[in-house]
Design a protein with these regions (language model features):
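Conserved, single-site charged/polar hotspot
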Residues: 1-281
Length: 281
């Protein structure tokens, strides 16, 4: 059973910080949206390959210091994974920290620094998840997600009027015409934790990553690892990765598998210090 928390707070009417867990589906452990892990149901996920993998690993559990791991995952980390506590409640899981998604450590610098994050987001490092191999992607993405051509690095633009209306509709806060979007705090992967939105009616800092992604997209922005450029009344978001970036990178893991890494090596790559143990037959 998945148990979680929900938090929403305002600080002197200057901040709106929220993270999500189970409040939107109290009668179910998971839902089929970015809110959870986009669980698509047993009818879509339970293929012969999945059955084979389940049987081969029956009774195996990923643990950290004797405790079962909270083994989070996202579609594409963009080359670097994020800390759990930067995304959800302020709980530190040592195995859910930053790693670079490559055979050898990538030199990223401190991605909490704005100029370093900008350089990283605009680059195309040789990460496992930097792939366009359709066969590999078909193992991870369902049919409609495969229509997405650019997810390792991506771009989306909005006129100021359209963006202002979108933000109001998606999070219910009327900024008026949005004049500026400023990064306030980034996590270790470069993902934004807090963003300051300045409009002609209101200025407010919002967070965490999911509310940021929700605010700037009809569904969810690919990730909160982005920079914003404004020119001639157009806001352009340049971003990295797809999803919250915590834990296992699904596309990176698929590439690792295609290159001959076994599942134990893949888990050790994404969940540092964890151990697979056999709990039952």
């Amino acid at each position: 059973t998945v148990r979680g928390t929900y938090s929403s707070c305002r600080v002197d009417q200057e901040e709106y910080i929220r993270w999500y867990d189970r409040e939107d589906h109290a009668h179910f452990d998971v839902c089929a949206d970015d809110h959870c892990q986009r669980y698509q149901g047993i009818s879509k996920a339970y293929t012969p390959a999945v059955r084979e993998a389940l049987e081969a690993t029956r009774g195996e559990v990923l643990t950290y210091e004797g405790t079962i791991c909270d083994a989070r995952f996202s579609k594409c980390c963009g080359g670097a994974t994020e800390r759990f506590d930067n995304t959800w409640e302020p709980v530190v899981h040592p195995y859910l920290d930053k790693i670079t998604d490559a055979p050898e450590d990538l030199e990223t610098g401190d991605l909490r620094d704005e100029q370093t994050a900008r350089k990283w987001i605009l680059s195309f490092p040789p990460a496992f998840c930097h792939t366009t191999d359709r066969q590999i992607l078909s193992q991870v993405l369902n049919d409609y997600d495969q229509e997405t051509q650019h997810f390792f690095r991506w771009q989306v633009s909005y006129p100021a009027e359209q963006l202002s209306e979108l933000v109001y509709r998606k999070i219910g806060i009327d900024f008026g015409t949005i004049r500026d979007i400023q990064p306030i705090e980034r996590g270790v992967s470069g993902r934004l934790i807090r963003v300051k939105i300045t409009g002609d009616k209101k200025t407010l800092v919002i967070g965490k990553e999911l509310i940021i992604r929700k605010a700037f997209s009809e569904s969810h922005l690919y990730s909160s690892a982005f920079i914003v450029e404004k020119q001639d009344g157009i806001f352009t978001f340049h971003g990295a990765g797809w999803g919250h970036g915590v834990g296992l990178c699904q596309i990176g893991a698929a590439v690792m598998g295609a290159r001959g890494y076994n599942y134990k090596a893949i888990l050790q790559h994404y969940f540092k210090g964890c151990e697979l143990i056999k709990m039952y037959e």
